[in-house]
A protein has these predicted regions:
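Intrinsically disordered, low-complexity linker/terminal regions across diverse proteins
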Residues: 1-61, 66, 70-167
Length: 167
């Protein structure tokens, strides 16, 4: 929007409407935007939801995913104020690059359609955010009573229901 050019950034302004079914991490504001619409779990009524599904969906695929974007191949380049600054130590950068390269190679091997491979480098940020989201969501879910009780619902274990929610 050209009328904003040269003016101070309004850090309270969202780029999407509250009812939007999406979430995002904005590195230049160092913020995660989670509109109300994103908390509707597709295919479920609220009374049908259990912690496993909610943590798999909301914790992993949404909140954890967006948090992890702050530390992926792009988000890590911004400091806590949203400035484009190198703030990691050389050792941290080297360790990150080593692990990221493994993920790039792993995704390069995926062939979802015969003859077509995923570009692991191009999808790195999303792949890191997906993995980080899953791991953060699991850590949060492990603190719930449902996880501790470990009782099946509809013949599915709590962890199976967690991944059903993620899917």
């Amino acid at each position: 929007n050209y009328d904003k050019l040269g003016k101070p950034v309004n850090r309270d302004e969202w780029e999407i409407y509250p009812q939007t079914y999406n979430a995002y991490y904005n590195p230049s504001n160092n913020e995660i935007v989670l509109p109300a619409g994103i908390f509707t779990v597709p295919g479920y009524r609220d009374e049908e939801l259990d912690d496993a599904v909610v943590y798999g969906y909301g914790g992993a695929s949404t909140i954890g995913h967006e948090i992890t974007h702050g530390f992926d191949d792009e988000g890590r380049q911004f400091d806590e104020k949203g400035n484009l600054v190198s703030w990691w130590t050389k050792n941290d950068e080297a360790a990150f690059t080593k692990r990221a390269d493994v993920m790039v190679q792993q995704f390069n091997e995926f062939e979802p359609v015969k003859g077509y491979h995923i570009n692991g480098k191009a999808s790195l940020g999303e792949n890191i955010a997906d993995l980080g989201g899953i791991l953060l969501g699991i850590e949060a879910f492990k603190k719930t009573q449902q996880f501790k009780d470990n009782k099946n619902i509809s013949n599915l274990t709590p962890m199976q229901r967690y991944f059903m929610g993620y899917a």
